[in-house]
């Protein structure tokens, strides 16, 4: 909202399949469904604006990264701002999820459901904090797809906002992907956030103190790219 207001831009939020509902719905997600969601969102963006700026967080960043290497999947995108992009989770054994019997092994080790405690009312309201562990399989598959993507041929300028203290995803891979990125790019490491995991590094729920600063950083970057 803050970025769109500052740029006087139209704004469209997309909701990836399975998200924003109850825990059971999370199992409905798939890599193909999320790619379709992304392409639909870009089509809407092209319809309501002259240029499309993508702001992608966490596994949304995985999706935007893969799409940036597929010309037909990122047509019309002028820039991408990544916030804590997911190029590999830190959870031990995550790579087993996409192996044969990955779902069965995950359920045997961790149970059929995953959950985490919420930290405040906004966290409780806007996060799905209990869901089938099977819902993590497409997340891992998309993460692997993004990490293996030939980002050297990316032509879309990118801004990577992340924390080296991220306890959820691997910041070393963010630095690696940025180093391989074929188009102009910038790294914005963030040290102090409100999130104890240093993953949700902006937003009223977990990191309100950094929201304004990071929104302004994105605005300055976009204006420099677009000559505003």
Where are these regions (language model features)?
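Short alpha-helix in the alpha/beta-hydrolase fold that links the catalytic acid
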Residues: 156, 169-180
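Active-site nucleophile elbow and catalytic-triad environment of alpha/beta-hydrolase enzymes
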Residues: 133-150
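Catalytic active-site module of serine/aspartate enzymes centered on a nucleophile-bearing elbow/loop
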Residues: 194-228
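Conserved alpha/beta-hydrolase
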Residues: 4-22
